[in-house]
Design a protein with these regions (language model features):
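Transmembrane alpha-helix boundary/hinge residues in polytopic small-molecule transporters
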Residues: 19, 54, 92, 108-109
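Secretory targeting signals
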Residues: 1-8, 34-100, 116-127, 145-172
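Transmembrane helix boundary and interhelical loop/hinge segments in multi-pass membrane proteins
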Residues: 4-26, 30-31, 38
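Junction motif at the cytosolic side of a transmembrane helix
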Residues: 168-190
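Membrane-interfacial segments
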Residues: 15, 19, 59, 63-68, ...
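Residue-level recognition of membrane-helix boundary sites in multi-pass small-molecule transporters
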Residues: 19, 32, 106-107, 165
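Transmembrane helix segments
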Residues: 104-142
Length: 190
């Protein structure tokens, strides 16, 4: 939630305060402004995601002793890397939606709804309709697990997606809002 709010606030805060005009005066090429915001946000989100997992490992290591994961274990290292990439994807999705909506409340509401609310009705509907379960598996929070949790067996028959398909869908959730934001931002008045 932190990186989603940060992603939305990076641009909606400028729109609400009128600072977007100053930003566009300093960087008149809108694509470059969007790209720079996306790059800085991606670095910060990756560091927040990976850093929080590393910090929780460091705090829990003395208590768990030999039961704590090892940083040399590939599964745990992949979890750290995947958590960072997961945060990058969510932050970019929020940035794109923030550019599109230009409203802090609207962007945050939409992101939180996609991440935490949309799966609830789909989960109830999936008991009656198979398509609802498949759609639920394509939501950002569900496919993000393909990046960070390598222990999930994607070919066990309980998932209709493969791990690579889930990663591609998650990438689409991150990239499509940014591309749409670029298209709209380059043609719309500030």
């Amino acid at each position: 939630v932190v990186v989603a709010v940060l992603g939305a606030l990076i641009i909606t805060g400028e729109y609400s305060s009128g600072q977007i005009r100053s930003s566009l005066a300093a960087v008149p090429r809108r694509g470059r402004l969007l790209l720079s915001k996306a790059v800085v946000l991606s670095v910060v989100a990756f560091l927040l995601g990976s850093g929080s997992v590393l910090l929780s490992w460091a705090i829990s290591k003395p208590f768990l002793g030999e039961h704590a994961g090892s940083l040399t274990d590939w599964d745990y290292s992949a979890y750290i890397l995947g958590s960072g990439l997961d945060c990058v994807g969510i932050a970019l999705m929020a940035l794109g939606i923030g550019f599109l909506l230009r409203s802090t409340a609207g962007a945050i509401t939409m992101i939180v709804s996609l991440l935490f609310v949309a799966d609830l009705p789909l989960q109830m509907m999936s008991q009656k309709w198979e398509w609802a379960g498949k759609l639920m598996e394509c939501l950002p929070r569900s496919v993000a697990a393909a990046l960070s949790d390598l222990s999930i067996n994607w070919s066990d028959g309980t998932h209709f997606l493969t791990q690579s398909q889930a990663i591609a869908i998650f990438a689409a959730w991150a990239i499509i809002p940014v591309i749409a934001a670029w298209l709209v931002f380059s043609r719309r008045d500030a």
